[in-house]
Design a protein with these regions (language model features):
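Surface-exposed beta-loop interaction hotspot
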Residues: 1-2
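N-terminal helix-cap/turn-to-beta initiation motif at the start of protein domains
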Residues: 5-17
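A short, Trp-centered hydrophobic/proline-enriched beta-strand micro-motif
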Residues: 17-26
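Amphipathic, interaction-prone secondary-structure segments
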Residues: 27-56
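Structured surface patches comprising rigid loops and adjacent beta-strands/short helices at the edges
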Residues: 37-44, 60-79, 97
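Short, exposed beta-strand-loop hairpins at the edges of beta-sheets
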Residues: 80-87
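Edge beta-strand at a domain terminus
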Residues: 87-98
Length: 98
């Protein structure tokens, strides 16, 4: 199912406020395979239009920031959101976990 940035922002904000964690993966972020388990996500935006997504793994220095401006498409299937980007970066999957 395709989603707007605003829908995605609202859902991630709601899930985060309820203390949910996420597994985040991509085959290529800065030429490195990325797989972060048990991440916390904070969306900083004005109604999901402008802003960024801050993804960090508690108790580590692992942090990834994604600007909303480069997100081309957002899809959701089951408990996983897939972000596609305008600049050709590999898709990022964000899986909701307990």
């Amino acid at each position: 199912m395709e989603m707007t940035r605003e829908q995605f922002f609202n859902e991630i904000t709601e899930l985060s406020s309820r203390g949910r964690h996420f597994n985040v993966s991509s085959s290529d972020i800065g030429n490195v395979n990325l797989y972060l388990q048990g991440c916390v996500i904070k969306a900083n935006a004005e109604e999901g239009i402008n802003g960024e997504l801050n993804i960090y793994k508690p108790y580590t220095n692992m942090e990834v920031t994604i600007d909303f401006d480069i997100i081309e498409e957002i899809t959701k299937q089951d408990n996983t959101y897939t972000l596609s980007f305008v600049n050709g970066l590999s898709d990022v999957d964000i899986e909701v976990i307990q």
